[in-house]
Amino acid sequence: MRFTIISKNDEKSKKTRSYITKELEKRGMKEDKIKPEIIISIGGDGTLLGAFHMYQHLLSETMFVGVHTGNLGFYADFHPEESDLLIDLIDRKEFVKTEFPLVHVKVHTDNGEENHLALNETTLKMVQGSTLAIDVGIGGKHFEKFRGDGICISTPSGSTAYNKSLGGALIHPSFQSIQLTEIASINNRVFRTIGSSIILPSHHTLNVYPNKNDTHLLTIDHLHFQLNGISSIEYKVAEETIKFARFRHFPFWHRVRESFISS
């Protein structure tokens, strides 16, 4: 099996990377940074997000597994002290593939069209922190006029991240959906929004129409893009998915409990 390892630059992560690389190569596996069959992320969820964006062109051919060098993350199943167990399981190919949905973002600007994939979430705000003014459409029909700090569109697995801090719902990754959550919306007699998170199934699209004369800040996970002349943005459940190699059962709701309410 061809593998590659993406790790943080701290000593613990680098040491873990060196050990896993050496042991996998001892067992006849080849490190291949160009076309890996499995990508091992060592660090935190941010490290895995970076690995995802680095290899998103290979989503149909590869899978991910996380080793967390801090506290357990949502995308990590192993700690560094479990490296030998992970190595054995990879060697024996004792895993199942679990697929998580992604959000596809299509941006139309004066300069053409941009397409992005997000694993956690994508947001739209104003660059200078002023009020974002957009028309919102669902399924090709006008839904509302939004005024506020911004909007957040998250995946089910990303619903536990920024979306949760905004008061959005937590969604199990088995649901093929995206979630729209408002960021500090303005609601009064003049401006009125739905005020609740909206969960859209895979056959629905979300469209927003900003003011083309404004400069907007578009985020795709940890990536930031400053864009001018945006005429519209389309959000939907992506056709692509991210595949995780699951070597043991670790339910989503157990991860939620351990991260947020377990003492």
Question: Where do the PLM segments sit?
Answer:
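Catalytic phosphate-donor-binding core of small-molecule kinases
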Residues: 1-36, 72-152, 160-263
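Glycine-rich phosphate/dinucleotide-binding loop and adjoining beta-alpha-beta core of small-molecule
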Residues: 47, 51-66, 76-79
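Conserved SAM-binding loop
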Residues: 41-42, 64, 153
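Short, well-ordered secondary-structure micro-motifs within conserved domains or adaptor modules
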Residues: 33-53
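Short glycine-rich anion-binding loops that position phosphate/pyrophosphate groups of nucleotides
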Residues: 44-47, 70, 157-159
